[in-house]
Amino acid sequence: MKLHYCLCILLVVTFVPTALVLEDVTPLGTNQSSYNASFLSSFELSAGSYSGDDVIIAKEGTNVSLECLLTVDHYGEVHWYNSKGRQLHSRGGKWLVSDNFLNITSVAFDDRGLYTCIITSPTRASYSVTLRVIFTSGDMSVYYMVVCLIAFTITLILNVTRLCLMSTHLRKTEKAINEFFRTEGAEKLQKAFEIAKRIPIITSAKTLELAKVTQFKTMEFARYIEELARSVPLPPLILNCRAFVEEMFEAVRVDDPDDMGERIKERPALDAQSGIYVINPELGRSNSPGGDSDDGSLSEQGQEIAVQVSVHLQSETKSIGTDSQDSSHFSPPSDPASAEGSTHHRE
């Protein structure tokens, strides 16, 4: 906040209590005039009384003179009436009528109101004057003045304290900005954060320059953190994780789940399918030497042999083949003559 704004606030706070104290006072018109007529020495218009067109304002306890502005005959009489309609006589005391003036001694707050003067010659006419009295006595007025004075004092102290705090804040902010432009490296970013807390008081030019420098330093800090993260040593397995996973998938090929399901369903059916196949008796014997040496076997009729066949998967077939090869290596064939004898015995 600028200094002249603070001064305006101080002026407003200074004059508001005064206006509240004088709230019963009506501003006078532009045609204010003072009556220089010759009054009695004891009823001269006091310094606390003011006169306007038809309004007279006086403080409580002062003497007031009201003038009737009607043209009065030399032998005519003027009659004065108060706001209650009671005629005021000049028999001494508080009221005193002299020619066309009404003099009031020690005006009280109850004397306020409209006063009317009436003449009967040369013509009947009337003229009214309003009297307003400023209430200055009593406990309430003193209490009100004390309250206003205390409020004004507190407000003034708060405003002065605020000005001092703002001045201190501005000095600290200026010092922080100067230190920001003098520092380099990581400390400059820290100074930028300190200045950011005081942003509302910074001028526009310095704010723009500070924003540019802060943005550049923030990006530089981000790059520094990124390089620092890359320089941290990590295990080779974590660094080569993607290559390791790709090699693993190439080594172990995963089939389609749908095809695997179909194969699992077909496997029991293949295992269950078994049948008896008849060998054609017209098939000739093999061209083995053993067959040619056996002349009697050519004249014999063929016989049907029942063979049970089962279907296995490729992997099972390979395992069976391996087992049969192993057994053939460890069990050599028997004597040909004994083999032929057993054949004839079965026939």
From Swiss-Prot:
Principal location listed in the UniProt entry: membrane
Extracellular side: 23-139
Post-translational modifications: Glycosylated.
Ranges that cross the membrane: 140-160
Keyword annotations of the record: Cell membrane, Disulfide bond, Glycoprotein, Immunoglobulin domain, Membrane, Signal, Transmembrane, Transmembrane helix
Positions annotated with a glycan in the UniProt record: N31, N36, N63, N103
Biased composition (Polar residues): 311-331
Gene3D superfamilies reported in the protein's UniProt record: Immunoglobulins
Ranges for domain Ig-like C2-type: 47-130
Cytoplasmic face of the membrane: 161-347
Membrane topology: Single-pass type I membrane protein
Function of the molecule: Component of the elastin-associated microfibrils.
Protein name: Microfibril-associated glycoprotein 3
